[in-house]
Amino acid sequence: MRIIGLTGGIGSGKSTVARIWQGCGAIVIDADAIARVLMEPGSTVLEEVSQVFGRDLLDAEGKLRRAELAARAFISEEKTAQLNSITHPAIRRQIRRGIECARAEGVQVLVLDHPLLFESGMSDLVDDVVVVDVPAELRVRRLVDLRGLKEEDARHRIMRQMSDEDRRMRADYVIDNSGSRDVLERLARELWQRFATQVE
């Protein structure tokens, strides 16, 4: 089984590429979706996060107030590392389980969609790395316009991630998403076809 690591900075369009590939028949493990499940009320991960970052992160129903966690965790490298030290091992365990299930089911090409593929040390799980690349200033605009983030918050989150240059240097393939959605769709489909052909 060939495992493709799909990554990119916040606001790069990485998840859009994952959806395009799913439309082409790709099986995708979504690290963000795993993280959301691990943060559901009653989970041991959420319990540990609330102990470290404050019980007031939880609402009356025990649900995580995500924006508040982001405000506390992304304020410094130390706090970000603290959050990652809690979440990354649990996410990695779930990803490994997903990979083993896919292998047992005879999946030929598996996609691991992970925003922190390198930072989390999970690039060792994949055979090829695809980076979705967009200039930082364009990502800031997209985060503000499409996700409703404040400009300062958008810049802060981008700063806390690996630099675009470092990501590109570690990539086997780079998809440039500085153009239109139609261009992204064409580039993503062409690359997926290449992967699918290589395993036939």
Curated annotation (Swiss-Prot):
SUPFAM superfamilies: P-loop containing nucleoside triphosphate hydrolases. PROSITE patterns: DPCK. Pfam families: CoaE (PF01121). GO terms for biological process: coenzyme A biosynthetic process. GO terms for cellular component: cytoplasm. Keywords: ATP-binding, Coenzyme A biosynthesis, Cytoplasm, Kinase, Nucleotide-binding, Transferase. Belongs to the CoaE family. This is Dephospho-CoA kinase. The gene is coaE.
